[in-house]
UniProtKB/Swiss-Prot annotation:
InterPro entries: Glycosyl_Trfase_fam3 (IPR000312), Glycosyl_Trfase_fam3_N_dom (IPR017459), Glycosyl_Trfase_fam3_N_dom_sf (IPR036320), Nuc_phospho_transferase (IPR035902), PYNP-like_C_sf (IPR036566), PYNP_C (IPR013102), Pyrmidine_PPas_bac/euk (IPR018090), Pyrmidine_PPase_CS (IPR017872). One of its GO terms (biological process) is pyrimidine nucleobase metabolic process. The enzymes which catalyze the reversible phosphorolysis of pyrimidine nucleosides are involved in the degradation of these compounds and in their utilization as carbon and energy sources, or in the rescue of pyrimidine bases for nucleotide synthesis. It is an enzyme of class 2 (transferase). This is Thymidine phosphorylase. Pathway: Pyrimidine metabolism; dTMP biosynthesis via salvage pathway; dTMP from thymine: step 1/2. Its EC number is 2.4.2.4. Belongs to the thymidine/pyrimidine-nucleoside phosphorylase family. The lineage of its organism: Bacteria, Pseudomonadati, Pseudomonadota, Gammaproteobacteria, Vibrionales. Homodimer.
């Protein structure tokens, strides 16, 4: 028998906690025998003293096991269960192509996703812009769609990692969000409760990333890879670039359109293509669905070219309550904004840099995202035809097309877009889409 305050005292004094102590504390969080004040004190003690790798693994496992851990064995899947998690960015629509692409190559992708908060878009909000799509199906429907389509993207239910929900809510109001140990446990407890065989992490780097510096992003990626593998789930991470909007669009219905056009081959933004292929290839390799990256990329290109990936997306949407013809007639099922006009730079020159976070906030300002969790979303608004770093902005080439509800909203967004993009006479050096890969042997 332990006392929560003694566990807090031990961490406060910078001593290593045992797995039993961490388990006891997190069970108390889930059962509500540990108070919010005690959670806050624990989080602050961890914030100042950090956790060792064994402590992080114990915390992640305790939070994962605080609720239901999905067991897929009764489904008799004839392939591995694999998933991807991104730390979030702007125009980061990879999940909508990646799930169907990996499914078409023989993987099963039961993806439990989140909503957007702050400048980052949420996969669930994007999918909810499709009329009828149900992000909270029963467990039976979740399993059935995963089996039949190979992929099902849904929202987190209350019975997955409930301790994380309480801990996160407290961290949010006590300035203890930005701590590597706590971030690692929060991300992985939810993902690992989905009963995965393997996981690929997409950790963003740059002006639109969650972590402020390359070094911090790399540290988080290494922590996640070490902890997930320590908790028994084969995991690798890719560090990918978020110094510019990843897709050509930012906004919910706009990004769904782009994802469908990507799957059908109508249009593939080159940076989005590279990041999506790199993540999918890594998923196939660690799930033993391909022998190496080259083999994986060839398989992925095949399912894009023969329409199998698009077909998996269509099956998923229909299976979760959406229309049966989303691939063929996507415009009939996605809202459009009343005003769609370009915004031009005030000067001519190369796009030197962009504040991706501010571009994300421009979409939020139009109603396309949330400032607080209770905000409602306008699915139609956002940006499309985004200019890329190194391109020339002039009176022919706009910075973006702005999709707005009215003139005033368009003007506010136009000012925000112009303020977020730096135009210069000098062409910037190209940045890679993928900086590095972190495998278990690297940590």
């Amino acid at each position: 028998m332990y006392l929560p305050q003694e566990i807090i005292r031990k961490k406060r004094d910078n001593k290593e906690l045992t797995a039993e102590e961490i388990n006891f504390f997190i069970q108390g969080v889930a059962k509500e025998t540990v108070s919010e004040g005690q959670i806050a004190a624990f989080a602050m003690a961890v914030y100042f003293n950090e956790m060792t790798m064994p402590e992080r693994i114990a915390l992640t496992c305790a939070m994962r096991d605080s609720g239901m851990v999905i067991d897929w064995s009764h489904m008799n899947f004839d392939g591995p269960i694999v998933d991807k998690h991104s730390t979030g960015g702007v125009g980061d629509v990879t999940s909508l192509m990646l799930g169907p692409m990996v499914a078409a190559c023989g993987g099963y992708v039961p993806m439990i996703s989140g909503r957007g908060l702050g400048h980052t878009g949420g996969t669930l909000d994007k999918l909810e812009s499709i009329a009828g799509y149900n992000i909270t199906p029963s467990n039976d429907v979740f399993g059935k769609v995963t089996k039949e389509a190979g992929v099902a993207i849904i929202g987190q239910t209350g019975d997955l990692a409930p301790a994380d929900k309480r801990v996160y809510a407290t961290r949010d109001v006590t300035a203890t969000v930005d701590n590597i140990s706590l971030i690692t446990a929060s991300i992985l407890s939810k993902k690992l409760a989905a009963g995965l065989d393997s996981l690929v992490m997409d950790v963003k780097v740059g002006s639109g990333a969650f972590m402020p510096t390359y070094e911090a992003s790399e540290e988080l990626a290494k922590s996640i890879v070490a902890v997930a593998n320590g908790a028994g789930t084969k995991t690798t991470a890719l560090l990918t670039d978020m110094n510019q909007v990843l897709a050509s669009t930012a906004g919910n219905a706009l990004e769904v359109r782009e994802a469908i056009r990507f799957l059908t081959g109508e249009y593939r933004n080159p940076r989005l293509y590279e990041v999506t292929m790199a993540l999918c290839a890594e998923m196939l390799v660690i799930a033993n669905l391909a022998k190496d990256e080259q083999d994986a990329r060839a398989k992925l290109q095949t399912v894009l070219d023969n329409g199998k990936a698009a077909e998996c997306f269509g099956k998923m949407v229909f299976g979760l309550g959406g229309p049966s013809d989303i691939i063929e007639n996507y415009d009939n099922h996605l809202e459009s904004a009343q005003i769609i006009k370009p915004v031009f730079a005030d000067t001519t020159g190369f796009v030197q840099a962009m504040d991706t976070r501010d571009l994300g906030m421009a979409v939020v300002g139009m109603g396309g995202g949330r400032r607080v969790a209770s905000d409602t979303i306008d699915y139609a608004v956002g940006l499309s035809d985004m200019i890329r770093l190194g391109q020339t902005a002039d009176n022919q080439q706009p910075l973006a097309m702005i999709h707005a509800r009215n003139e005033e909203q368009w003007q506010q967004a136009a000012n925000a877009v112009k303020a977020a993009i730096v135009i210069s006479e000098k062409q910037p050096e190209a940045t890679p889409e993928v900086y590095r890969k972190i495998r278990p042997e690297d940590v």
